[in-house]
């Protein structure tokens, strides 16, 4: 760290953002749009908003985060809607709480468009530089940054969004080199600065699979994975939607030969060879981790996904590895359809420094240094969507800090974004954190479809939602409210022609009459059915129809979830048996069983605060304890 009295500043800004990945871009755009003079510093101006791993946005829980960032006025959802190669709704056969939109994106187009956006944003300057030091004022508040080559910039707030670049080292087998990503040098000096300031730092690991030439692949041996015929959107702003031709993805599977090659060469991987001890992401394991952890699985799904419309590279999803390069090609060629593949880039593992986010307030400002914020992978998360969500939170609060306004804490009951930040700042997490729907006890309330209803009023209050977006939002909510009133008030009689048709086609009688709302509550009956019988409202958009239907159809479930939340709160002081073997509680997630058995919490409240133990696990544990107690009272053998 450098003290203020020994520094000559080249220029002055309100906010400086260090790192121009998905977190840094959201943070910088937010502060600039809120009127702060902002400087965005990056190691490479040509890699702004780069997608170094899977070029995709969305998926379970991640799509909810993307919708929420958009609802606040952020950019990631718009980018995915403009640059997608394919879109699919995952979990569509289940309830709307777990519906997940996923877009395969064109990585070069995505980066080029985001670069153009940040380059042309008012109040935002971008520059290539490596930040190595923070400049502190007389009261240990941040007042600037210093670069590797000795240039200093003054500011009132700094947002660190350094990704995997702090002390980054990439591994292929037992070979390593300093790098944040393949071909890009690591950031030096900043970790040491943070350590000198008293911050705890740790090491984490992630990895990315090889890329192969699409012209060397035989798709006829793979299963086609087309996009959805009906395209859905991340952004609530129809003006940014771009209808475009979709490209197919494909699926293949590992073979006994794949597994043999990996098992016989495990000792050559960075982790199993003992050269890397950093924890990797539990929910995105390397292929060697899968073979070791799931011994009884004969085969694993591998998805073959295009990286762009006009480039030959294919991303081999589910096949990340740190094994030696010469072995990687043998492994790839053991997959059906890839027998003659040409490898364009090898897979590699990367380890990097991170700051456990318990050192931050829920505003994402650090507790030790006023004006210093951290967001994204440096906080121990994994994923572009998690990074973008933290970026907009840090950007909003840095702007408010600069203006001496009260900073905003996003409550976990209002958003996945709030759940994410709350988990990071309160739980001692020692492995990369990925957002999951099970991490939220409010997931029925926190759906993709109502992210605007939950967060756009706040985005408007903050200053990120303009008049046009606000008018669109208020009209949509008025339409949904009015339609719900109509559905509750309008009745169909059993002797009407339409009533007879509905009873006949659904094999469910109508006794006397029924409201349209009660029809929608019937299993298998949807708004499209109302349209079919001429009972729908043709003036509504698909999103408005869906919003009204979900609110009505799931009203009972929403009330039940609220009751469960209140029950967990009441049970916080409930004692847990000291002899309880959590490995035998099958209704707990595997991660929860591991963590609970290790910590042996004394109460339900303590169990709920353990990293990796989700609200769904706590609910399952309460049910298990009730069953255990019930059996004990009946004099039956106690459950194990």
From Swiss-Prot:
Pfam families: GIDA, GIDA_C_1st, SAM_GIDA_C. SUPFAM superfamilies: FAD/NAD(P)-binding domain. It is found in: Cytoplasm. Its main location: cytoplasm. FAD binds at residues 19-24. It comes from the Bacteria. NAD-binding protein involved in the addition of a carboxymethylaminomethyl (cmnm) group at the wobble position (U34) of certain tRNAs, forming tRNA-cmnm(5)s(2)U34. This is tRNA uridine 5-carboxymethylaminomethyl modification enzyme MnmG. The lineage of its organism: Bacteria, Bacillati, Cyanobacteriota, Cyanophyceae, Nostocales.
């Amino acid at each position: 760290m450098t003290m203020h009295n020994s520094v000559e500043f080249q220029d002055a800004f309100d906010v400086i953002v260090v790192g121009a990945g998905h977190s840094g871009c959201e943070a910088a755009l937010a502060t600039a749009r809120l009127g702060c003079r902002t400087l965005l510093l990056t190691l490479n101006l040509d890699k702004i908003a780069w997608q170094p791993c899977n070029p995709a946005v969305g998926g379970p829980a991640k799509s909810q985060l993307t919708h929420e960032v958009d609802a606040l006025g952020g950019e990631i959802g718009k980018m995915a809607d403009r640059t997608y190669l394919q879109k699919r709704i995952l979990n569509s056969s289940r309830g709307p709480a777990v519906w997940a939109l996923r877009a395969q994106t064109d990585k070069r187009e995505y980066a080029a468009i985001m670069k153009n956006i940040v380059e042309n944003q008012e109040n935002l300057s971008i520059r290539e530089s490596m930040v190595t030091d923070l400049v502190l004022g007389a009261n240990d508040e941040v007042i600037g940054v210093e670069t590797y080559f000795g240039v200093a910039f003054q500011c009132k707030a700094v947002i660190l969004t350094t990704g995997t670049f702090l002390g980054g080292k990439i591994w292929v087998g037992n070979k390593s080199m300093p790098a944040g990503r393949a071909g890009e040098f690591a950031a030096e000096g900043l970790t040491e600065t943070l350590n000198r300031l008293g911050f705890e730092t740790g090491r984490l690991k992630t990895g990315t699979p090889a890329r192969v030439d699409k012209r060397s692949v035989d798709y006829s041996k793979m299963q086609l994975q087309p996009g959805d015929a009906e395209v859905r959107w991340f952004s609530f702003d129809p003006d940014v939607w771009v209808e475009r031709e979709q490209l197919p993805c494909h699926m293949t599977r590992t073979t006994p030969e794949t597994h043999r090659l990996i098992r016989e060469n495990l000792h050559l991987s960075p982790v199993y060879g003992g050269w890397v001890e950093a924890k990797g992401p539990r929910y995105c394991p390397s292929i060697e981790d899968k073979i070791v952890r799931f011994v009884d699985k004969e085969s694993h799904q591998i998805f073959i996904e295009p990286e762009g419309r006009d480039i030959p590279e294919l991303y081999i999803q589910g096949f990340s590895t740190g094994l030696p390069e010469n072995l990687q090609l043998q492994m790839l060629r053991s997959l059906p359809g890839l027998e003659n593949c040409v490898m364009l880039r090898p897979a590699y593992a990367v380890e990097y420094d991170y700051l456990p986010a318990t050192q931050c307030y829920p505003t994402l400002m650090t507790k030790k240094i006023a004006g210093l914020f951290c967001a994204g992978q440096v906080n121990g998360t994994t994923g572009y969507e998690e990074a973008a969500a933290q970026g907009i939170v840090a950007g909003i609060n840095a702007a408010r800090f600069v203006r001496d306004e009260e900073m905003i804490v996003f409550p976990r009951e209002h958003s996945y974004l709030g759940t994410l930040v709350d988990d990071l700042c309160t739980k001692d997490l020692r492995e990369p954190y990925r957002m999951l729907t099970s991490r939220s006890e409010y997931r029925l309330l926190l759906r993709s479809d109502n992210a605007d209803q939950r967060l756009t009023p706040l985005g408007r209050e903050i200053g990120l939602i303009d008049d046009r977006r606000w008018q669109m939002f208020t009209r949509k909510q008025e339409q949904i409210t009015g339609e719900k009133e109509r559905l509750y008030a309008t009745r169909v009689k059993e002797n009407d022609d339409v009533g007879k048709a509905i009873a006949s086609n659904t094999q469910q009688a109508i006794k006397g009459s029924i409201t349209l709302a009660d029809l929608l509550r019937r299993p298998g009956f949807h708004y499209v059915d109302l349209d079919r019988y001429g009972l729908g409202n043709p003036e509504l958009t698909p999103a408005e129809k869906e919003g009204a239907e979900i609110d009505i159809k799931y009203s009972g479930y929403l009330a039940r979830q609220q009751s469960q939340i209140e029950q967990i709160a009441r049970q916080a002081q409930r004692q847990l048996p000291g002899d309880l073997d959590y490995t035998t509680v099958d209704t707990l997630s595997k991660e929860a069983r591991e963590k609970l058995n290790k910590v042996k919490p004394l109460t339900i409240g303590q169990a709920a605060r353990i990293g990796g133990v989700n609200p769904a696990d706590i609910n399952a544990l309460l049910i298990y304890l009730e069953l255990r107690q019930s059996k004990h009272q009946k004099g039956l053998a106690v459950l194990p």
